[in-house]
Structures are given as C-alpha cells and as structure tokens.
Amino acid sequence: MTTEDTENKNVIFIVLDSLRKDKLSVYDDEVDFTSNIQQFAENSRVYANVTAQAPWTLPSHASIFTGQYPWDHEATHKNTHLDTKRELLAEKFQSEGYETYAITPNAWISKPMGTTKGFEYTENFLGLASYDPVQNIFESLRTRFDSIDRQTRRKIAGFLDGVFNKIGSSDICKSRETVDEVKNTLQKIDEDENFFLFTNLMTAHEPYEVGEPPREYL
C-alpha cells in the first residue's frame, strides 16, 4: 500500500435536489443537454442502481447523514426534524480531523432541522444557520406543524409551494449564490487542511425557466 493510498482525501458532496435520473445523458442516451455532467461522469465511478430512501428532502438527507432508513432515524412527515442525539456524517469527518462545511439554500439543511450537526461552518442563505430568533420561530412552527394531521399538512405544503412559485424560483433557489460561496470557501481553505464540504443545489426542485444561454452549466 502506497502513502497516497493511506492519505486522507478531501470530500465534496454535491446534491442536485430533485434532479431526475432520466434527465441525465449519463443514464439516457436520448438526453442531449447535460454535456458537462456527462464529461464529469466519464472520468468517475457511476452507479447504475441507486434508490433514494424517501421521496422528499428531510428523510432523504437524514438517511444520507445517519446511514439509517427513515423508520430508524424517524425524521419524516410525522416528525419534521432529525434527533440531534444521533451521530451524523459530518461528526464522523470531524473526529478524523476534517474541517466541515455545509453550503445550501435548502431550509431542511439547517440547524432548526437538526441536519447540520457536525458542520463547523454553515451557510444556507435563508438566515437559518445560526440566527437564534429565527430558530425559535422555526421550532415553534415545526411543533405546531407536527401536531396537524397528514392530509392538512399536505394542503399547507402545497399552498406554500404555490406561493414560492408565484414569487419566482430564482428568488428561492439561489444556486448562483451557493456555487459562488462554494468556490470562495474552497479558495480560502488551507491546502494542508483536510475538509468535507456538503452542498445542496435547488434549481431542479422548482419550475425551470429557460434563460440565455439556457444550458451553459449543464
């Protein structure tokens, strides 16, 4: 075994929230608009059979961060936060001497949701990273939301999605700001520092409005 094999590797974990497998040329030859992702995949390990553990953000990320199924970590519609007593992926990296970073505009990846434990640096562009008054409001709303029956919760969630869509996806996705912050963070990290950086990009989660150039970054 060489020295290179035993050295710690830096890890960048990128989630393209809600991006469908059948919209990537890596998995479908008829797709012709994801050339950059295709190029990246050609020099990478690609898994052909991967299944998400849940159909929405919180339980899916809770499974990623805990290595558990939703019925084990219990962060679901019934209990809309992750128990902070559980050891999360970022904490494991911390214990190995890694600096840990979470950069995302996703409200489910935030301190009030219990999903950022172990990340020393958190930026989520929604004021939810470390602002205690907002956290208190979020926890209060979450407690009330959890007490409502499932059908009513779905109606509320659908209404809020409609409100966000009226506002405009560009206002809430903040993908450009997220990518810029990731780049700035990487530039600031000392080259001798081992790091784990997690980012979640939300553009595919919202209706896509074609811009100019429409496919520059795909």
List the predicted regions and their residue ranges.
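Catalytic domains that recognize anionic headgroups
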Residues: 1-218
